[in-house]
Amino acid sequence: MAFTGKYEFESEKNYDEFMKRLGLPDEVIERGRNFKIITEVQQDGENFTWSQSYSGGNIMSNKFTIGKECEMQTMGGKKFKATVKMEGGKVVADFPNYHQTSEVVGDKLVEISTIGDVTYERVSKRVA
């Protein structure tokens, strides 16, 4: 299914446990809990631009082509190299400390991040 669209944060599961597992300080976890994230995805075949805007004006944007190594950036600004894949209609990426899958289900963008035995799920609703 096509990913292109603008999505607004709707719900999440296991936020605190996942962020603690990543090693984030309590004050950063608390501040992040109040973010209203807007995700914008532009897909042109195998080419993607994936941007997330956070409360306070911070924006993280990654450009990648399915199956090709690229340089990406974490929310904290750390740059790393990864090869993003498409598996069963899901965009799959390995970040430095966790594994993430993203898929469109109806009008929702479902992002699942896993570190060890902790899984974080963020659901966003398509608004455009």
From Swiss-Prot:
Cellular compartment(s): Cytoplasm; Membrane
InterPro entries the UniProt entry points to: Calycin, Fatty_acid-bd, ILBP
Membrane topology reported for the UniProt record: Peripheral membrane protein
Entries under SUPFAM superfamilies matching the protein: Lipocalins
Keyword Cytoplasm: yes
GO CC terms: cytosol; membrane; nucleus
One Pfam family named in its UniProt record: Lipocalin_7
UniProt record, GO biological process: fatty acid transport; steroid metabolic process
MF terms (GO), sorted A to Z: fatty acid binding
Primary site of residence: cytoplasm
Domain comment as written in the entry: Forms a beta-barrel structure that accommodates hydrophobic ligands in its interior. Can bind at least two ligands per molecule, however, the stoichiometry is debated.
Family: Belongs to the calycin superfamily. Fatty-acid binding protein (FABP) family.
Role of this protein: Binds to bile acids and is involved in enterohepatic bile acid metabolism. Required for efficient apical to basolateral transport of conjugated bile acids in ileal enterocytes. Stimulates gastric acid and pepsinogen secretion.
The protein, known as: Gastrotropin
Organism for this UniProt entry: Rattus norvegicus (Rat)
Source species taxonomy: Eukaryota, Metazoa, Chordata, Craniata, Vertebrata
